[in-house]
Amino acid sequence: CQCRRQRQMCIRDSSKGDVSTAELRLDMQKAMQKHAAVFRNTEILDEGVKKLGDIAMDMNNVRIQDKSLIWNTELIETLELDNLMGQALVTIRSASERKESRGAHAHEDYPERDDKDWMKHTVMWLDEKNKSKLGYRDVTLSTLTNEVQSIAPVARVY
């Protein structure tokens, strides 16, 4: 909780840049729409990782004019954007690393599902500077109790 509060105060107190929250949010939205839509390819994803990284760096140059702590919608929107930016970075970086198509992730360069290499959860950590560390976690295919049977995974067919 203390780390979160420190992050919030840091954003509020050091936001003397020249880029508005609205500008950054719109740039992030456009980048995600263009580079992380449902149908993706390696080139688009790689461009998107770079583009979104550049946009995320602009969070260091965000401007918050209202420094109050009461009814400060500008601060709230910036804190929301900070959270959304982290989610966007994780989403696009995870998608660029996954060399298969699965569920809502359709990779045009890898149209098949690959359970042998990709039956795993992608886990990512972001540091204070939005640098990411990628990891993986096994998928649990069994149920917690014997009350219900486990269902084997199958490819989605539309």
Specify the residue positions occupied by each region the protein language model found.
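C-terminal amphipathic alpha-helical interaction region
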Residues: 61-158
